[in-house]
Design a protein with these regions (language model features):
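Short clusters of small/polar residues that mark proteolytic maturation junctions
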Residues: 13-14, 99, 175, 190, ...
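Conserved functional hotspot residues or short segments at active or partner-binding sites
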Residues: 182-231, 235
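Active-site lining segments that contact anionic ligands and/or coordinate catalytic metals
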Residues: 118, 143, 168-173, 206-208, ...
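Cleft-lining beta-strand/loop regions that shape enzyme active-site pockets
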Residues: 3-166
């Protein structure tokens, strides 16, 4: 029962159940025929939702596209590859995972014909953009298919695999690192080198390595995806 300040009592029955949050909370046309898609996660089937939203925006006359990945913590790797495939040709290597065992090493390529290889794209990112979101934004940057706008991303370049435990529990085990088209890994924290107290730190910029995009632009590994255009605040 719930009571108010006036001591009225309201009785409500609440049913506990699973709720599927939308992967695309909003999409629409902005001024100047700019299409906008807010992609909040990579759980479920976001590539299907994204495709439907994009095709609808095209019908409405969108001539350019903004993909908002701010605070998107990631999810399924293959879903990020699917969305990249909408904008780049078939047969492109998007992600390579490398682990200590053969089963943890894989290559993910674009397998289908794209939806649109010409529409101008801007991707919004911030420090909450992580994992599969960095695969999407970093791959589009490496292939010179989009302009990345905002702040440096989180820097999660590791792949975890869930293992079932008794009593319905799960344990996530890190099995590999992932590498995007330029060959770089965006992992920011160097777990291989710990401080005396056992803590770990981010890889300093001075120790990062230069890689190159398809058009020859310099990009760096470590520390996430750095934007092409840095903005302190995006409203």
């Amino acid at each position: 029962a719930l009571s108010s300040a006036a001591s009225d009592v309201y009785k409500r029955q609440i049913v506990r159940r699973s709720i599927q949050m939308p992967t695309i909370p909003y999409y629409g046309i902005m001024e100047g025929q700019v299409g906008y898609i807010n992609l909040s996660s990579f759980s479920g089937t976001p590539s299907k939702d994204f495709k439907n939203a994009f095709l609808d925006l095209k019908k409405q006359g969108a001539t350019s596209l903004v993909i908002d990945l701010r605070n998107n913590g990631g999810g399924l790797l293959d879903q990020a590859v699917e969305i990249v495939n909408f904008f780049v040709p078939r047969g492109k290597t998007i992600v390579t995972t490398k682990g200590k065992i053969k089963q943890a090493s894989n290559t993910y390529k674009t397998l289908r014909e794209p939806l649109d290889t010409d529409i101008p794209i801007a991707v919004l990112v911030n420090s909450g953009t992580a994992s599969s979101s960095e695969i999407l934004s970093g791959s589009l940057q490496d292939l010179d298919r989009a302009v990345i706008v905002g702040n440096r991303t989180y820097g999660k370049g590791l792949v975890q695999v869930p293992r079932s435990l008794p009593y319905g529990g799960n344990l996530k085990i890190t099995t590999s690192k992932y590498y995007i088209p330029s060959g770089r890994c965006v992992q920011a924290i160097d777990y291989a080198h710990r401080n005396e107290d056992g803590s770990v730190a981010r890889i300093p910029d001075s120790l990062t390595t230069v890689f190159h995009t398809a058009a020859g632009r310099e990009v760096r590994d470590g520390g996430g995806v750095s934007p092409d255009l840095s903005l302190i605040h995006i409203s």
